Swiss-Prot record:
GO terms for biological process: mitochondrial translation. This is Small ribosomal subunit protein bS6m. Component of the mitochondrial ribosome small subunit (28S) which comprises a 12S rRNA and about 30 distinct proteins. GO terms for molecular function: small ribosomal subunit rRNA binding; structural constituent of ribosome. The gene is MRPS6. Keywords: Mitochondrion, Ribonucleoprotein, Ribosomal protein. InterPro entries: Ribosomal_bS6, Ribosomal_bS6_sf, Transl_elong_EF1B/ribsomal_bS6. It comes from the Eukaryota. It is found in: Mitochondrion. Its main location: mitochondrion. It comes from Bos taurus. PANTHER family: MITOCHONDRIAL 28S RIBOSOMAL PROTEIN S6, SMALL RIBOSOMAL SUBUNIT PROTEIN BS6M. One of its GO terms (cellular component) is mitochondrial small ribosomal subunit.
Length: 124
């Protein structure tokens, strides 16, 4: 299963309502076969511009980041479910960048200058 990140903006609510909305969201992910790795609260802040969702205009929102594994076939279903949730302003699922170690390219090892000179002298 590939790894995904769900960037989620919830409408500004009190702590119990926010917890209930997050619980609903995570249960929806797990019901569709996802394995949740982590949930990160990025805080509540003013939105960069007024956003409309479910016939309401929002100026503040809570930002959350969910890291999860899921089958590729369920991502569309997850997005459809989240777009219908009245507490969600913006859901956005992106494939997690690969976290492999970056190896330094060995490339072509430069030949020492002396060997290069000797090899050219022998040819003549």
């Amino acid at each position: 299963m590939p790894r995904y990140e769900l960037a989620l903006i919830l409408k500004a609510m009190q702590r119990p309502e926010t917890a209930a909305a997050l619980k609903r969201t995570l249960e929806a992910l797990m019901d569709r076969g996802a394995v949740v790795r982590s949930l990160e609260n990025l805080g509540e802040r003013t939105l960069p511009y007024k956003m409309s969702a479910h016939s309401q205009r929002h100026t503040r929102g809570g930002y959350f980041l969910v890291d999860f594994y899921a089958p590729t076939t369920t991502v569309a279903s997850i997005m459809e479910h989240l777009s219908r949730d009245i507490d969600v302003i913006r859901p956005n699922v992106v494939k997690h960048p690969l976290t492999q170690e970056v190896k330094e390219c060995e490339g072509i090892v430069p030949v020492p200058l002396e060997e290069k000179l000797y090899s050219t002298k022998k040819r003549k």
